[in-house]
Amino acid sequence: MLYIGIDVGGMSIKAGLVDEEGNILFKHSCPTGVERGYGAVIRDIAQLGLSTVEKSGHSMDEVKAIGIGIPGIMDQRTGIVPFCTNLSWHDVPIIEEMKQYTDLPVYVDNDATVAGLAESVKGVSAGTKDSLFVTLGTGVGGGVIMNGRVFSGSHGVASEIGHMVTVAGGLPCTCGKRGCWERYASATALIRAGRVLCAEKPSCPLMKQVNGDIRAITAKDVIDLAMNGDDDCVRIFDNYVYHLVVGLTNLINVYDPEVIVLGGGVSHCGEFLLNAVRALLPKYVFFKTMPYARVELATLTNDAGIIGAAMLGKA
């Protein structure tokens, strides 16, 4: 059987036809056009998915299901998206809307969750039963795979790992709490620390790298200087890794996965991040004499959303 996988982002919708092994047979995309409202976007999601089959030369008779990954939360009990900030969606009945365009079963989940599923089917965690996917971008997102299946919890929020508190009474988070993990382990955290550094040391190499414009600092700027041995950026990066490892340790204690996969923008520095995490993690895991999760880098990158969404329908 074949599956339609659809990756919905704030800027584009990507669809692919995927086989049982997670191979993409055909894919194409279109702009999201969020400003048109959810009805028009969902119509395009459906039409793009269905046209993917037609353009691939395959038949709809071969397709078992449609899977959709969204940058928000999906309530599996009701078929409603309670909120999805990037799409400006609130209480959107996506399953009912999709029924206007197809009789195929439709499955929807968070985009980080489907990326984790993709890695467990076709990527670095393939062959494992229990794995976690952690995406390090503007915030921190996650996907939980237990016994080879997506685990989203009773209310669809089991993978909102970025909002577990790792620093009691810490920095305020956009969610309203203080001390959330993503305030310390995201790309945004590196940018914030870089801006503080430049404000305190206007002549530092980081300030020179961005031509004196603090607003232009990126996580990559900070990491690049750390990789080149700049003392201040090394300090920032080491502190970042510490907070990342604290959160990973909590996840290991709760889920005991075989593999934790790191994705997102920060992970693009590759072995520099991976080696730092692997070096520090043994100091914080609880059972130091027993095996614990190995940490790896995501391998599927841009195709993970399509593959993982498609695999939602395989279960």
Q: Residue spans of the language-model regions?
A:
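Short loop/edge segments at beta-strand edges and connector loops
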Residues: 108-112
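ATP-binding/phosphotransfer module of carbohydrate and carboxylate kinases, centering on a glycine-rich
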Residues: 1-65, 75-78, 95-106, 118-128, ...
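Short hydrophobic alpha-helix segments
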Residues: 28-30, 85, 154
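Conserved A3 ("GATE") glycine/threonine-rich loop of ANL adenylate-forming enzymes
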Residues: 11, 114, 138-141, 161, ...
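Short beta-strand segments
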Residues: 7, 67-71, 133-139, 143-145
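Short, charged low-complexity linear segments at domain edges
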Residues: 144-160
